[in-house]
């Protein structure tokens, strides 16, 4: 599957609120989001599944691949396009064995060593960061900065997406590292108009 990593939205239902969640995602997709990750850390499996069904329908309507954060079981149950795992989740090779060769497998990294490990173990893309300090993840590690992001991209052949503290003010600088896309949460979902926010980020990325 050819994947456009340019603008990768990670969801946060707590940030948006349950009432406006699906509408915000729709608006973000209308604005040009190219990849969508459903991340639900504060919910049970059934609720995650029910939300996932609706989000998958939205993603399919716009032809955007849906990635599930962490939950390999729910990625399979939903027949999502892929799954994204971190350093503390199931081993990458085990995840690849479970999901098979055709699903997209993403891996969170914060160093070149972790990136090379991800490449060896079958990741399709790497989420590198946090690039800048971020308030969207309570457990976020120390920011890696642009120099390390550039080092990670130069050291692997996989697509690399920058994540963490990225928004309109710093997106151009992030792009200059040579990475393949940016992953955002609040830069779209915290904005009054998620559609306009996504369009603005895509304009910055493409120009």
From Swiss-Prot:
GO cellular component, one term: cytoplasm
Superkingdom of the organism of origin: Bacteria
Catalytic function, reaction form: 2-[(2R,5Z)-2-carboxy-4-methylthiazol-5(2H)-ylidene]ethyl phosphate + 4-amino-2-methyl-5-(diphosphooxymethyl)pyrimidine + 2 H(+) = thiamine phosphate + CO2 + diphosphate; 2-(2-carboxy-4-methylthiazol-5-yl)ethyl phosphate + 4-amino-2-methyl-5-(diphosphooxymethyl)pyrimidine + 2 H(+) = thiamine phosphate + CO2 + diphosphate; 4-methyl-5-(2-phosphooxyethyl)-thiazole + 4-amino-2-methyl-5-(diphosphooxymethyl)pyrimidine + H(+) = thiamine phosphate + diphosphate
Annotated binding of 2-[(2R,5Z)-2-carboxy-4-methylthiazol-5(2H)-ylidene]ethyl phosphate, by residue: 134-136, 165, 185-186
Binding-site list for Mg(2+): 70, 89
Positions annotated to bind 4-amino-2-methyl-5-(diphosphooxymethyl)pyrimidine: 37-41, 69, 108, 137
EC number: 2.5.1.3
UniProt-listed GO biological process terms: thiamine biosynthetic process; thiamine diphosphate biosynthetic process
Family annotation (Pfam families): TMP-TENI
Details of cofactor binding: Binds 1 Mg(2+) ion per subunit.
Cofactor(s) in the UniProt record: Mg(2+)
UniProt pathway: Cofactor biosynthesis; thiamine diphosphate biosynthesis; thiamine phosphate from 4-amino-2-methyl-5-diphosphomethylpyrimidine and 4-methyl-5-(2-phosphoethyl)-thiazole: step 1/1
InterPro entries xref list: Aldolase_TIM, ThiamineP_synth_sf, ThiamineP_synth_TenI, TMP_synthase
Keywords associated with the record: Magnesium, Metal-binding, Thiamine biosynthesis, Transferase
GO MF entry, a single one: magnesium ion binding
Family, per entry: Belongs to the thiamine-phosphate synthase family.
Main function: Condenses 4-methyl-5-(beta-hydroxyethyl)thiazole monophosphate (THZ-P) and 2-methyl-4-amino-5-hydroxymethyl pyrimidine pyrophosphate (HMP-PP) to form thiamine monophosphate (TMP).
Protein name: Thiamine-phosphate synthase
Annotated organism of origin: Desulfitobacterium hafniense (strain Y51)
């Amino acid at each position: 599957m050819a994947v456009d990593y340019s603008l990768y939205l990670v969801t946060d239902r707590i940030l948006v609120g349950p009432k406006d969640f699906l509408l915000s995602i729709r608006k973000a997709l209308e604005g040009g989001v190219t990849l969508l990750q459903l991340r639900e850390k504060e919910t049970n499996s059934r609720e995650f599944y029910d939300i996932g069904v609706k989000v998958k329908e939205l993603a399919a309507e716009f032809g955007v691949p849906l990635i599930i954060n962490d939950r390999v079981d729910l990625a399979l149950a939903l027949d999502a396009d892929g799954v994204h795992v971190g350093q503390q989740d199931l081993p990458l090779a085990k995840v690849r064995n479970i999901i098979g060769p055709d699903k997209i497998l993403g891996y969170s990294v914060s160093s070149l060593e972790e990136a090379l490990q991800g490449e060896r173990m079958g990741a399709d893309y790497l989420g590198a960061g946090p690039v800048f300090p971020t308030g969207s993840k309570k457990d976020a590690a120390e920011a890696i900065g642009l120099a390390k992001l550039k080092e990670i991209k130069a050291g692997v052949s996989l697509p690399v997406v920058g994540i963490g503290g990225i928004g309109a003010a710093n997106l151009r600088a992030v792009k200059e590292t040579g990475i393949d896309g940016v992953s955002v949460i609040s830069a779209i979902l915290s904005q009054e108009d998620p559609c306009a926010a996504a369009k603005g980020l895509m304009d910055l990325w493409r120009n």
